[in-house]
Amino acid sequence: MSRAVVFSVLSNSTKLQNLGFTSGYILPNYDGYQRPNISINQNNPFFMVLRWGAQRFDPRFYRGPRTLDIWVHMAREISTDYSRIDAVIEIIDPLLTGIIDTPGADGQSVTSIEMMGRSVDLEDPVYQTLCRNASYKIISRNTTTGAE
């Protein structure tokens, strides 16, 4: 499924780190019940949640693409300017689509990642944030057992 490759690329991006996406601000698959403490520091109003979706199998290959939605959240008490969220997504797009045949620490290698689209501007009443998501199609393979 290649979670490790994606998480590593996002976590190690200097551009994202400069926007405040450090440890604890990239949440794997609804990791936290409360939003990170983003409202204290106006230089760090963001966090993101990685939501792995369904995988559609092709019976000829016993595998298929899996969807990944990356939700970028911004504290609405700091800003209501969605262009700040758009700028984060613009950084994420080339990071992910540039991953080709990359092995991960979880025994999965990413074969390719394609952009699929972006959501409308949304509000999250639970996290009390403004947010958007970007969707990606990920093709990966298991590299620990030699399976293709």
Predicted regions and their residues:
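Small/polar-rich, solvent-exposed N-terminal microdomains that initiate assembly or binding
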Residues: 1-61, 99-106, 147-148
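Extracellular/virion structural assembly segments
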Residues: 75-97
